[in-house]
Amino acid sequence: MVKKIAIVLFFIMTSCNFEKPTQFSTEALQDTLYDVSHKKYSFQQVLEQYKGKKIVIDVWASWCRDCVRGLPQLKELQRKFPEVTYLFLSVDTNVNSWKRGIQHYQIKGEHYNLPKGMKKGALVDFLNVSWIPRYVVIDENGKITLFKATKASDKNIEKVLKNS
C-alpha cells in the first residue's frame, strides 16, 4: 500500500507543471508569427518592438467562445491600463477567420497569428496552452510577471499591472 501511494505521489509531482518561468525559452522566442499584413516575425522581434512597456498577451482564436466572452473584461483592462501594450496572439489556422474576428469584435491592440494553431509550435508548447483564452503579463524589463491566467477578469492581472 505504501508503495502504491509513493507511486501515485511521484506521478502527481512529476506530471504537474509547478514551474512559473520569468523568461521565455530560446525556442519560444524563435517561433514564427505573422502580422495582419502577413509579414513574418520571430516572437522575440515582436517583443522587442514593445521593450520598456508592460505587455498583456492574450492567446485567443476567433472560434473560441470563451475568448469572445472575455473581450468585455479585456476591454475594461484596456480602459483601466491604457499605457499597457495589448498583444493578441491568435491560434486561428484560418487567416481570414482571424482577420474577420479582429474586425467583427473590434479588438484593439497588436495582432499576430501563430500559423500552426494551438497544437504545435515552440511558443504554445512553452506556454503549455491547453485552453484558451490564456493571458500572460510581461513587465517593462521583459520579465514574465504572470505566467497563466485563463480569464481577463482574473484579479492577478490587475495586481501585476499595478505592481510591476
Label every PLM stretch briefly.
Residues 107, 116-162:
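Thiol/disulfide oxidoreductase modules built on the thioredoxin-like
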Residues 31-55, 72:
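A short beta-strand-turn-helix
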Residues 57, 87-89, 136:
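Conserved hydrophobic packing residues within short motifs/helices of P-loop NTPase cores
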Residues 1-37, 164:
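N-terminal targeting signals for export/organelle localization
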Residues 59-76:
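Conserved redox-active cysteine motifs that mediate thiol-disulfide chemistry
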Residues 53-55, 59-63, 131:
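Short pre-active-site segment immediately N-terminal to redox-active cysteine/selenocysteine motifs
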Residues 33, 79-119, 129:
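Conserved segment of the thioredoxin-like fold in thiol-based oxidoreductases
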